[in-house]
Amino acid sequence: MSNSFTLLFSSFIGFLQIYLILLLIRVSLTWFPNVNWYGQPFYSLSRITDPYLKMFRGIVPPLIGIDISPILGFILLQCIMQIVSNIGLSS
């Protein structure tokens, strides 16, 4: 039973790591104004990441016109990854 939990936790952490990379790409691309968010692959990227990022918009107001709310998203995702990793190691 322990092996199945280990596999489950490691798979979930792998998914979260991939999602974290997608978030990083999405946030990095917002610095390029010529990105067409309605063309592929950018449309798919925004559809995958925007629901998560929208949870944090409005919590922190933009500073000097820069939206820093994705930082909260990164921090929360890292905390979840750490918690899941610790649970997986202890089981």
Swiss-Prot record:
Organism per entry = Guillardia theta
Q: Where in the cell is it found?
A: Plastid, Chloroplast
Pfam families from the xrefs? YGGT
Q: What is this protein called?
A: Uncharacterized protein ycf19
Q: Does the keyword Thylakoid apply?
A: no
Q: Does the keyword Plastid apply?
A: yes
Q: Which InterPro entries match?
A: CCB3/YggT (IPR003425)
Q: Which UniProt keywords apply?
A: Chloroplast, Plastid
What Gene Ontology terms describe where this protein resides (cellular component)?
chloroplast; membrane
